[in-house]
Structures are given as C-alpha cells and as structure tokens.
C-alpha cells in the first residue's frame, strides 16, 4: 500500500477522511460508556458508586494500551514517511510483543490490588462486593485490550482508519446488546448483575480482536508483525517507550485526578463521588469524538514530519484545532442548558441531580478553551515530542487542578471544587499554545 497520499492529498478532505471513521467509532464508544452506566445504575446506586470507584483502574489499563499504542503509531508513521519500511516493521513487531507483556503484568497486578484499592474509598460492604465482582472479570481481558490497541494503531499508521472504526464499533455494539441480557438475565441468559456488565465488556473486546486478526491476515498491509523482526534494537525500543510512557502518563493522569477527587469528596457525601463518576462518563461524548479527530491527525503529522513537510504539519494542526473547537462549543452549550436532564439519566436521587447539575454547568465553562490543550498534546505526540505533551497533561490533571480543588474545597466547601476545572483549562491552554508554537518553529529532524 502506498502511503504517499498522506503528503499529497489536499488537507481538508485528507483529515476528514482520516478522522471521520475514528469520530464515528468514538461516538459509538461514548454511547457504550453512557448505556453501560445507565444499565448499572438500574441495579442500584451502590452499583453505580462501585463502577465509579473501579473506573480509575480501568482507565489506567486503557491508558497503558492507548499510550503505548501512540508510541507504536508515531514511530511507524515517521519511518514510513522517511521511506524506512524495515524499521516500521520492527517498530510494529516490538510494540506488539511489549503490549502482550504489559497485559500479563496488568492482569495479575490489578486483580490482586483491587480489594485494597476500593477499601481506601469506601467501607460499604455492598459497594466493595460489587466493585470486586466487576473488576475480577473485566481485568482478565487486559491482554486482549493491549493486543486490540496495537492492531488499531498499526492500521491507523498506514491510513486504514475504516478497519479501526469497524473493529471498535463491533465491540461496542456487541457490548451494548449484551449488557441488559447478562445484567438482568433476559431470555435464556443468566442474571449476573455487575459480573454480567463486566463479561459483556470482555466479550465485546474479544470480538474486536477477532475482527482485527481477520482484517490483518485477509487484507495485508505494508507494515508486518513477524518473528523475524523481533531483533535487538535498543534505540528503537527506547523511542517506543520515550513516546509511549509520556502518552501513557497523559492518559493515566485522569485516573489519579479522579481518585484524588473521590477521596476528597467522599468525606462530605457519597453523592459527590457519584457526580464525579457521572461527569466522566458524560464528558466522553465530547472528548472521545475530539480524540477521534486527533487520532486522524496524528499519523498525518508524523508522516509529514518524517517527510520534512513542516508547513503542511502546521496546516493540519490548525485545521484540527478548529474542528475540535466546534465540538467543544456545542458540548458547552448542551451541558449548560440541559444539565439536570443529563444527570437525571443516571440517578433519581434529588440531591445528586441538584449537585450534579450545578457541577456540570461550572465544569463546562472550560470545554472550549480545553481545545487548545488536547489538540496540542496530540500533535506533539505525533511529532514524537512526548515529553512536551506530558507537560501539558501534568499541568491539566495534577499540578494546577489538584491544589486548586483542595484549596477551594477546604475554603468554600465541596460544591466549589468544580471551579478548579475551568480555571485549570485557562492556565494550561496558555502554556500549551506556547509549547506548540515553539515545536512548530523549531522542528527536530531526528527520530
């Protein structure tokens, strides 16, 4: 397959072609996140609390898979742009091997540690039981998640975005269908409650992997994963982790933030923990589609950067910025005007709806300005500048928001914690813009 279309095709139709499949798949994934939570919420509010508490660990596992996949994607795209097909194959093969290793370690570690982790945030026996039941099943599929993300990023690196889209949608749709069947025991399916929700998730992930394997072997691509490429290459492996670790941290930092917020707010009322969990489900409807556009941008930036087309890289970045800005503006308007309805989808508790509605209106004030941070972070990853991307995420998820949340909570009460979000977005966006401007002005030709 000839990937030169990435530096020859007009930018708007090119980015649209690359991004649209990922936006669609991310929207379906967002729908799954919402529907999955809605079904769990129908079990009980304790079940919803358990899901909210397990979410940071799930998010960390996904962060390792996606973040390391970003490293694989960036290196493959760069070497294809530089006409170094052999190195692209080595990057894909080494990435696949390390991803499986990550999956084994995370499966064992997460199952062993989840009871202790949950007990730090709640003493409610029902919440603990539901959380452990869910986690013990869903974490078994960590290896499959790692393999899925490797194939997804390999397909994306050669412009086969439709394959990624179909694979993601297949898993999400299967999950949506299986959720009510396995949770509530409809028809001949057993009533499994939280275990059913976890099993539905795992089956969906397995179906995605099966599809990727069929696509890889039936319609070969220019990048190959093979044992013959499993050769010692310390420089390449260091580059994989040099890009992958910052990307992993970028994605894992929200887990630390959520855990911090849960610990801070649980001392006041359980409804605040539920609100944080609901918000992070709702915001996927904005940030996942925006991430879909960024996924379409990233291989284009990497390929053109490797080919020395710096002006084209700038145009791709600025167009992505505008497209994500439209998504965030729409999201801000919807969340501000319909917050009671959105929170009410997950709970009928009047206190939770009131607290959640107020929180959502406050947080959404930072959506539009966050466009700069998320787009710059994704572009820097595509440019193999993982360290600078990590700086943006550290500011956004740790260095600004955690001190702000703590001070606001202690000074004005838990309801004021949510102001830390929009203040953080403004501060981070200013620094992200400067980092991106510097990177585009001073391109690094080494990889």
Locations of regions flagged by a protein language model:
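Structural signal for membrane-spanning alpha-helices in multi-pass inner-membrane proteins
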Residues: 110, 153, 179, 183, ...
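Short runs within selected transmembrane alpha-helices of multi-pass transporters and secretion channels
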Residues: 69, 73, 138-156, 164-172, ...
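Helix-terminus/linker motif at the lipid-water interface of multi-pass membrane proteins
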Residues: 27, 31-49, 118-125, 181-192, ...
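Transmembrane helical elements of multi-pass membrane transporters/channels
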Residues: 17-36, 137, 171, 204-208, ...
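Small-residue-rich hydrophobic transmembrane alpha-helices
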Residues: 48-108, 145-164, 262, 275-339, ...
């Amino acid at each position: 397959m000839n990937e030169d279309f990435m530096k020859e095709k007009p930018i708007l139709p090119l980015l649209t072609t690359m991004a649209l499949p990922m936006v669609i798949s991310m929207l379906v994934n967002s729908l799954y996140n919402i529907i999955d939570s809605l079904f769990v919420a129908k079990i009980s509010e304790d079940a919803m609390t358990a899901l909210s508490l397990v979410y940071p660990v799930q998010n960390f596992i996904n962060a390792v898979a996606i973040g390391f996949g970003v490293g694989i994607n960036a290196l493959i795209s760069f070497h294809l742009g530089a006409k170094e097909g052999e190195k692209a194959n080595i990057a894909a093969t080494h990435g696949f091997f390390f991803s499986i290793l990550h999956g084994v370690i995370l499966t064992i570690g997460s199952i062993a540690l989840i009871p202790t982790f949950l007990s730090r945030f709640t003493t409610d026996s029902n919440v603990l039981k539901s959380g452990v039941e869910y986690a013990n099943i869903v974490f078994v599929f960590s290896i499959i998640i790692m393999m899925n993300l490797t194939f997804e990023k390999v397909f994306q690196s050669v412009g086969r975005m439709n394959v990624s889209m179909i694979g993601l949608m297949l898993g999400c749709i299967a999950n949506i269908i299986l959720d009510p069947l396995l949770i509530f025991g409809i028809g001949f399916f057993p009533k499994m409650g939280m275990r059913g929700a976890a099993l539905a998730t795992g089956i969906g992930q397995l179906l995605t992997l099966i599809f990727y394997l069929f696509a890889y072997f039936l319609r070969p691509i220019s990048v190959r994963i093979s044992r013959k490429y499993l050769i010692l290459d310390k420089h390449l492996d260091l580059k994989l982790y040099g890009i992958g670790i910052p990307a992993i941290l970028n994605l894992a930092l929200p887990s630390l933030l959520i855990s911090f917020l849960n610990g801070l707010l649980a001392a006041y009322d359980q409804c605040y923990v539920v609100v944080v969990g609901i918000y992070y489900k709702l915001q996927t409807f904005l940030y996942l589609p925006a991430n879909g556009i960024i996924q379409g941008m990233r291989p284009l930036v990497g390929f053109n950067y490797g080919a020395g087309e710096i002006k084209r890289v700038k145009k791709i970045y600025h167009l992505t910025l505008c497209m994500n800005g439209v998504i965030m503006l729409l999201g801000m308007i919807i969340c501000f005007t319909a917050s009671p309805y959105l929170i009410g989808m997950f709970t009928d508790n009047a206190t939770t709806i009131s607290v959640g509605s107020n929180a959502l209106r406050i947080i959404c004030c930072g959506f539009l300005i966050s466009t700069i941070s998320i787009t710059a972070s994704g572009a820097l990853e595509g440019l193999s500048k993982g360290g600078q991307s990590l700086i943006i995420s550290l500011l956004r998820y740790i260095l600004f928001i955690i001190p702000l949340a703590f001070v606001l909570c202690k000074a004005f009460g838990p309801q004021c914690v949510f102001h830390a979000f929009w203040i953080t977005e403004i501060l981070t966006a200013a620094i992200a813009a400067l980092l991106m401007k510097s990177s585009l002005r001073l391109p690094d030709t080494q990889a």
